[in-house]
């Protein structure tokens, strides 16, 4: 397998742009090609949904034409919000196999011209249909994961909010030093806590913005000063209700183990990382899934300053998706651009430690198609001979039948596994909207919409019903539980009386 290097990179400023999607791609490509003298043999383009965002199809051919590269093979790659990383990995394989020597990788999206509700609807298209039927959005599902994480690792709600605030403040501070970032200013604690709730416990500053932008990387078989040492991809269930864990993304763990295995290193040899922080808690979970911190300890690393720019392991020194912006198809490529610059000493401010090796982690959908890339300086020496991690295997699940894809009638009662109150709702749903993942009496997990927003708590018992294919729940009140207990007791009284009478009769007979 041939070594794969990075010859050049380029990126537009992220944010709200008057340029078309094609113009953004061309600007990024022109910047990446400006400092290299290679003949591009193929184009790999990562973009999530130009058909709905900008009404454009056949985008790969359009970009090739606009760049004056007609005749050059052009391929569009899509894996939701990890599309840019997917394009990079596809190009890596093409060079590593020896089929091409020089490939231009592009990632981009144009989103800001649409309303927030329209963009939310398009982005929600990557999540499970049944969960969408109840009004779930990406933010709502991220919030439900956050609430479950808080409960599992026994972090109080107020404590968790302070941790998430620290992540947001850190990334906005980092982004304020990045000329390509959408947000050029920091965020204060006061601003964070006064920002509106999007989906409890997530606030506005916990969510990445809607953005326009593009990024480009030229991959080559010719030696340069930065190489791609390892790559990995993993997939996981699309729906939240079918997951083995609500506090970790198995797709990231699989991808990370494969990348570490290919690179022949362990997580301890990574100097910094750019991770997919579309929501602040996802940064914390990603650092655990990448093996930097034990499960349930990532939030402590934030609290102790370990992930800050001057910490032991800086996370998102560019500002991440949270501050740099998140034009969904561009983000996976932009992460590699940022790492390339920092490994070459071209990013400010400099990290306090010498940097030789870094990781990028890109998430597709709700963690259902994730990519990990390890980049290193070509002259980097290994600090130790630690054994590489072995790729984790994932046992295939049985294929879902047509019957499984149709929501079945839930049993009448269940228990809340996790929940959120959504304040920024999709079209057709009024805020505030209570959503919960409920385990019914048959042991099945169901996404359900609440009749009201009061008394929500993990473990609380609820009534379930289904209307037009959508599930609804009502929290059992304390009075209801008392009444049910009395009914059960009253139902047992006749049998108790009969048993007592029978016992007395036997005694008399004796």
Which residues are covered by each model-predicted region?
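Short aromatic-glycine-enriched beta-strand elements
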Residues: 424-437
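Conserved catalytic cysteine-centered active-site region
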Residues: 1-5, 50-103, 110-141, 183-209, ...
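Active-site-proximal alpha-helical scaffold in enzymes
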Residues: 78-109, 139-178, 217-222, 324-347
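Short glycine/threonine-rich loop-to-helix capping motif typified by GTGT followed
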Residues: 53-58, 241-244, 277-299, 327, ...
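OB/S1-fold single-stranded nucleic-acid-binding modules
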Residues: 380-418, 422, 468-509
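Condensing-enzyme catalytic core mediating Claisen C-C bond formation in acyl metabolism
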Residues: 1-22, 27, 129-132, 152, ...
